[in-house]
């Protein structure tokens, strides 16, 4: 982009290379982080509206036009509530835990490409970075349960950590398979790898995306992402009939809101990763003029919105699993299945019918 090059040259001349680099990095972080936080806020609104429609209700309607200001009312309510720290709790860890849960979900966006050159840090190990940084969130859950000094919070934290680690393995095997077929850990190159092939050459780009040849893995990824974020129907971590809110049971006010933000930020991140790994990222589904005029970040947003809506649909449609059923699904079905499919794809790539050349 020429105007960005002009801005960079003027900035370096005015402030010097080092100061400009620091300032420009902060600007890029703000430009990415603020919309993500707004998306998290309005995802709560969309969830309540969608579930309301499925229940033949209206959902939020009172605050602003058609309830569009409801997220801001919720934030104001949580900001004005007192953060009560239990007497016997470890106060420092009690406060740190919500931050540890939220920050990895925001830091992972540093390597997410919104377009061919629109990325904060276009590193060659981007996929590895996302897998590593998102695994840190489980520590926030464990610390919250332990620091609360409550048997219910600790039981919820144990459930959450075991469930998150279990389904991280399944997601890891799926992403390793995508790495295998794309031949790169760079997320921009993974997207570009889905724009090649016979279908892409004939304008049917959506048939060259990874979702078609790796359809079973795509399904496993979406279900594992729901379990990874402790969302319904895998939300036994906060089973209201047993342990109330799980590891968050002792939290209130803005500390509770940070856990809430972390959960929804992870939903958006994993949905965006599904769009990049399987749905062609910023590319248009059909390579014809009206569709190719739409900016890539809008296509990525549409695909992410469709995937994240599946999370909401699952919540409104399915009953909660028992904890032993969840662990059995992860360890006895998903992990072996993804391992077998990884071997199948590796063998497939050695045959004359390799479609990823």
From Swiss-Prot:
Query: What is an example of a GO molecular function annotated in this UniProt entry?
Result: quinone binding
* Membrane topology value: Multi-pass membrane protein
Question: What's the EC number here?
Answer: 7.1.1.-
Q: Which UniProt keywords apply?
A: Cell inner membrane, Cell membrane, Membrane, NAD, Quinone, Translocase, Transmembrane, Transmembrane helix, Ubiquinone
Primary subcellular site in the record, as a coarse category: membrane
**What enzyme category does the UniProt record give?**
translocase
Name the catalysed reactions.
a quinone + NADH + 5 H(+)(in) = a quinol + NAD(+) + 4 H(+)(out)
* TM spans (from-to): 20-40, 92-112, 127-147, 165-185, 206-226, 254-274, 294-314, 329-349
Subcellular location field: Cell inner membrane
Provide the function of this protein: NDH-1 shuttles electrons from NADH, via FMN and iron-sulfur (Fe-S) centers, to quinones in the respiratory chain. The immediate electron acceptor for the enzyme in this species is believed to be ubiquinone. Couples the redox reaction to proton translocation (for every two electrons transferred, four hydrogen ions are translocated across the cytoplasmic membrane), and thus conserves the redox energy in a proton gradient. This subunit may bind ubiquinone.
Q: How does the record describe its quaternary structure?
A: NDH-1 is composed of 14 different subunits. Subunits NuoA, H, J, K, L, M, N constitute the membrane sector of the complex.
Question: What family is this protein classified in?
Answer: Belongs to the complex I subunit 1 family.
Its protein name is: NADH-quinone oxidoreductase subunit H
Gene label: nuoH
